[in-house]
C-alpha cells in the first residue's frame, strides 16, 4: 500500500508541474488492499513489459531502491529519482536524486511532506491512500513510527475518507485466498 500511495502522490506532484507521469509496475496487483487502492484512486497502471523505458525522460522509484530485488527495474537502467524509507543500498548511491529517510516508518510520510512543501492539498482519495500507506508500513503506528509519521498521520486523517479507509483495510478477499487458507490449515501439523 505504501508504494501505491507514493506513486500516486508523486504523479500528483508531477502533474502539478505539468509533467506527464505514468505509474509502471512489474507484475500483478495481488494484495486486496492494493487492488482497492488502485480502484479507489482510479489509477491507470502500466505493466513494465507493456512499455518501453526508453520513452521516458526520467524514472523514479518510490518505496524501493535499485538492486533490492523487489522492483522490476532492469539492472542496466538507472533511475533518476529514488525516494524510500528503507536503509540505503549501494546502487542507490549513484542515483541523481535520492531521499532516503530510514528513520521514517513509511515512504508515504516523505511524500506527504513533499505535498505540503509544494502547497498541494491532497484530495480525499490521495490523503486516504497515503494515510493507509503509513498505517500499513508502521503497523498502526506501532512499528518504527516517528514524530514525522505521527504528524503526517494526523494531517492526512483530517483529509481522508475514513469510510473508504475501512473498506480498503477490510476489503473482500478473492475465493482463491480461502482455498489456499483451507489447504494450509488442512496440511498444518503441530510439533
Regions found by a protein language model. Give the residues of each.
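A structured phosphate/pyrophosphate-recognition subdomain
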Residues: 1, 8-15, 19, 90-191
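General beta-strand structural signal in soluble alpha/beta enzymes
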Residues: 23-25, 61, 82-83, 122-124
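Short secondary-structure capping/turn micro-motifs that flank functional sites
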Residues: 30-31, 54-55, 131, 173
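Active-site cofactor/cluster-binding pocket
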Residues: 39, 43-97
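Residues at the C-termini of beta-strands that transition into short coil/loop
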Residues: 27, 84, 103
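Hydrophobic/aromatic residues located in beta-strands of well-ordered beta-sheets
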Residues: 21-23, 80, 130
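Anionic-ligand anchoring segments at beta-strand to alpha-helix junctions in alpha/beta enzyme folds, i.e.
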Residues: 1-53
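Short, solvent-exposed polar/charged micro-motifs at secondary-structure junctions
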Residues: 33, 56-60, 177-178
